């Protein structure tokens, strides 16, 4: 049984080896090789092609940088805080910026060195 398998394998191998002499190796891509051999560019055409490639590359790079800058432009925003302290501070900030509610009816408070509740200092020379 094993001899039959080995002999059949050897026979097939011998046939393949004999047939390989009749086949000649052909290029994998014969069309592409012949096209590249036939194409020749003049100096003017080569410069125009190079300029177009450089222009496209610069445009693509500029677009990528623009998209990156749009994604990274973070506007400064304060965190939202709804606690009573934050709301009070925001209201006080708004009132101080807008001029307050009773700006025209402003009465100055009695503050200073002689205001009620402050100790008087005795000045000794």
From Swiss-Prot:
Q: Residue span of the signal peptide, if any? A: 1-25
Listed GO MF terms: calcitonin receptor binding; hormone activity
Gene Ontology BP annotations: adenylate cyclase-activating G protein-coupled receptor signaling pathway; regulation of cytosolic calcium ion concentration
Its localization reads: Secreted
Residues where Phenylalanine amide is found: 116
Q: Which cysteines are joined by disulfide bonds?
A: 81-86
Q: Which UniProt keywords apply?
A: Amidation, Cleavage on pair of basic residues, Disulfide bond, Hormone, Secreted, Signal
The record's annotation in InterPro entries points to:
Calcitonin-like, Calcitonin/adrenomedullin, Calcitonin_CS, Calcitonin_gene-rel_peptide, Calcitonin_peptide-like
| Family, as annotated | Belongs to the calcitonin family.
Question: What is the official name of this protein in its record?
Answer: Calcitonin gene-related peptide 1
Q: Please name the source species.
A: Gallus gallus
Its gene name is CALCA
